[in-house]
Amino acid sequence: MKHDWKPGTMIYPLPAVMVSCGSEPSEYNIITVAWVGTICTNPPMCYISVRPERHSYPILKKNMEFVINLTTRSLAYATDWCGVNSGKDHTKFEEMKLTPGKASVVNAPIIEECPLCIEC
């Protein structure tokens, strides 16, 4: 017997990453994103999914670049904290004692404490 289900999310992407954005220190922000993945390998393209009502959305839309920062076990608290607190109310780099570093290609900062930073 066939079942029809309402549209929804059946597959939950993992792991969560910290996405850093902003083109200058006054707008730097970190958002925790679970919806991240590969679109294509040639040319290389990846995606993140961010709701329009999130604080980072207009920053991402304005600058059209960001960094996907992979996390580690030691960054679990910061990853969670950055996901439940808004950049409107907090300076996340400062409060989590994370270091914004200079990216090679984009203006958005990398997170120095992360082992792998993918500039997009």
Regions found by a protein language model. Name each.
Residues 1-32, 37-119:
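Active-site-proximal mixed secondary-structure blocks
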